[in-house]
């Protein structure tokens, strides 16, 4: 577990003869530091983008926000701790699409319905990459799809570990395009996938743009298509989405801020306003787009409907793959 103080923001005490404890009690929330639990390791994609959000929230609320990294179990360890925290607003946390896959895999009984949502701030999207070293080389996604259809089971596709978010993306791509491939799942969330493709051990792979960017720029892999709802930010905005080519394929991982259930309404309102203002900061928008994600703010009311739709698609994919073990 890593604990890092993002920023220290002072809060003034009431003047006069009132003692420190009385002054703190008289202040509106927050009157002490807030903990933000993040279910991935420090430096991971999700961690990198939640930190500047919390830095801005800290400045807006006048209290430090302490990031506590608790990776493991597909982020389920962190989710359990957030859910079980005292609902006073002093423990909040990070969430992603793994909150859907965890329950469907039987890893955790919790899902996104079991938390207080405070706003979503960015969306990670997977891409399809092709090796420049393998025997089968492709310049476009259409070439890769055509080859897979003409040679069932011959295209080697590297994916994230079974059940991981980018594995779900790969299954969505395979099913949506109607191809038959030889999948090669790799440990973790996608870094090994890129290494396999770059080394010529797989023809194509599905990974995050952030994980593949250096290999794309170095020429070891080619960026063929995006599996998200929209195209990647510049300079990759000329690369098509698979959906715009006529295939019903889409998968994204939205990151959001949440807290335990049953938080006081006034505390929720304070946090929601701070998260929204932090996320809409022009400098944060620029940072998000430069970090190979798509910036977007989704208010709390929009998170559950969006995840309900995505959950239905994931459930079908996992059922077909024989790994549906929905926790009760």
What is the meaning of each model-derived region?
Residues 59, 81-90, 103-192, 242, ...:
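Hinge/capping helix and adjacent helix->loop/strand transition within the periplasmic-binding protein
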């Amino acid at each position: 577990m890593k604990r890092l103080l993002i920023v220290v923001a002072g809060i003034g005490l009431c003047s006069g003869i009132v003692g420190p404890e009385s002054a703190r009690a008289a202040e509106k929330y927050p009157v002490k530091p807030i903990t933000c639990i993040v279910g991935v390791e420090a430096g991971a994609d999700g961690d990198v983008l939640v930190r500047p959000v919390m830095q801005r929230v800290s400045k807006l609320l006048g209290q430090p926000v302490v990031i506590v990294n608790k990776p493991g179990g597909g982020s389920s360890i962190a989710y359990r701790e957030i859910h079980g925290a005292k609902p006073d607003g002093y423990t909040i946390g990070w969430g992603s699409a793994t909150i859907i896959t965890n329950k469907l895999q039987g890893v955790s009984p919790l899902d996104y319905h079991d938390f207080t949502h405070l706003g979503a701030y960015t969306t990670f999207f997977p891409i399809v990459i092709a090796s420049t070293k393998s025997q089968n080389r492709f310049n476009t996604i259409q070439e890769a799809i055509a080859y897979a259809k003409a040679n069932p089971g011959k295209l080697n596709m590297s994916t994230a570990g079974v059940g991981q978010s980018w594995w779900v993306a790969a299954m969505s791509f395979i099913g949506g395009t109607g191809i038959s491939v030889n999948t090669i799942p790799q440990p973790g969330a996608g870094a090994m996938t890129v290494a396999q493709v770059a080394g010529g051990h797989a023809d194509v792979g599905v990974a995050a743009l952030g994980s593949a960017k250096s290999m794309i720029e170095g020429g070891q892999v080619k960026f063929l298509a995006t599996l998200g709802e929209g195209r990647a930010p510049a300079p990759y905005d000329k690369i098509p989405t698979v959906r715009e080519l006529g295939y019903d394929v889409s998968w994204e991982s939205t990151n959001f801020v949440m807290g335990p259930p049953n938080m006081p309404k006034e505390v929720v309102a304070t946090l929601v306003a701070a998260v929204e203002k932090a996320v809409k900061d022009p400098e944060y928008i620029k940072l998000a787009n430069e970090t190979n994600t798509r910036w977007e703010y989704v208010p709390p009311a929009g998170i559950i409907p969006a995840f309900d739709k995505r959950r239905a698609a994931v459930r079908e994919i996992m059922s077909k793959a024989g790994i549906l073990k929905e926790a009760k």
